[in-house]
């Protein structure tokens, strides 16, 4: 959802009228658009939990989802369909073929998810966040870099008195990453480090009250968050590139279950090899790094590369969309 919001913001700035943009998402995704003057259609779209087999066995549910979308959007007058993947991507691909609409796909991970993999075999232009993305049709594939909020920046300089760690525990698998932080807080006292912990919707726990620890369910504008932290602890999903782009070092705890584990482990491998991140595969590794920081040991920061090779994809993707609109 966030790449779509960032893309829409850039399209507005380039003169594309809001009335020309419509969003199809689910109930959870629609919450991100509450304060935006844009047409958002919340639709209960079929989601396969068993990969390709699930789509094949539930063909009627997919047809129902397609018909719901066709009722909500005037596809006869639609010039572009854009998807960022997940369960809606195959439907977007089919609709682009059926209604002869220009189709764009954006893949946020180095190992494409099943949705984008299926969608990529429909006629389309594909944009990737990571170089050498696999598990996707390589035809018309362009490594543009990620779509980010271009307002973000990291103005914080590391001082000798306190190190601020931002924890993003609000994504898939948040229970594990949150529990690791709680375990550390239960076993240790925060003196020279401060933790800002995003726990995710409905995960706020009033019992977790510690010195130098702040807990929030959700941060809508990440600009302030990134400007406040020296280091980030998070999963290794596509959104992690945002922190890497502004040279915030990463301690990564990849999600270990289901198909998501593949793309997160590969994302993490790329970021570690590029010296943007270190891997924390268990509690002991995380505790070791935190305790070093408690001693104001800055050697961790010296290990990370400042030679940022990651591109920002916003302008390249927006230009292609506008070129298509102007045809």
Give the location of each predicted region.
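Nucleotide-activated sugar donor-binding and catalytic core shared by glycosyltransferases
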Residues: 1-198, 202-327
């Amino acid at each position: 959802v966030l790449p779509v919001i960032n893309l829409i913001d850039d399209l507005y700035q380039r003169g594309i009228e809001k009335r020309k943009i419509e969003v199809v998402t689910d109930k959870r995704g629609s919450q991100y658009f509450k304060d935006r003057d844009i047409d958002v259609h919340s639709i209960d779209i079929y989601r396969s939990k068993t990969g390709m087999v699930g789509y094949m066995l539930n063909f009627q549910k997919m047809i129902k989802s397609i018909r719901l979308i066709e009722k909500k959007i005037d596809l006869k007058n639609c010039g572009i369909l854009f998807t960022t993947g997940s369960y809606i991507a195959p439907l977007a691909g089919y609709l682009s073929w059926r209604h002869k609409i220009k189709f764009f796909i954006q893949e946020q991970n180095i190992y494409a998810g099943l949705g984008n993999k299926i969608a990529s075999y429909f006629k389309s232009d594909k944009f990737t966040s990571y170089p050498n993305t696999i598990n996707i049709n390589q035809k018309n594939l362009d490594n543009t870099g990620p779509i980010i909020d271009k307002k973000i920046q990291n103005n914080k300089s590391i001082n000798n008195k306190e190190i601020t760690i931002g924890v993003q525990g609000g994504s898939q698998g948040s229970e594990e990453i949150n529990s690791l932080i709680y375990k550390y807080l239960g076993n240790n006292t925060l003196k020279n480090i401060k933790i800002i912990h995003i726990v995710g919707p409905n995960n706020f726990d009033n019992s977790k009250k510690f010195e130098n620890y702040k807990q929030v369910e959700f941060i809508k504008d990440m600009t302030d968050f990134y400007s406040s932290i020296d280091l980030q602890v998070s999963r290794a999903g596509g959104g992690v590139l945002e922190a890497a782009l502004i040279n915030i070092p990463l301690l990564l705890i990849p999600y270990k279950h289901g198909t998501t584990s593949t793309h997160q482990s590969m994302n993490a491998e790329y970021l570690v090899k590029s010296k943007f991140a270190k891997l924390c595969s268990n509690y002991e590794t995380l505790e070791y790094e935190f305790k070093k920081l408690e001693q104001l040991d800055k050697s961790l920061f010296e290990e990370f590369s400042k030679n940022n090779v990651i591109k920002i994809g916003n302008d390249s993707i927006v230009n292609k969309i506008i070129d298509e609109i102007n045809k």
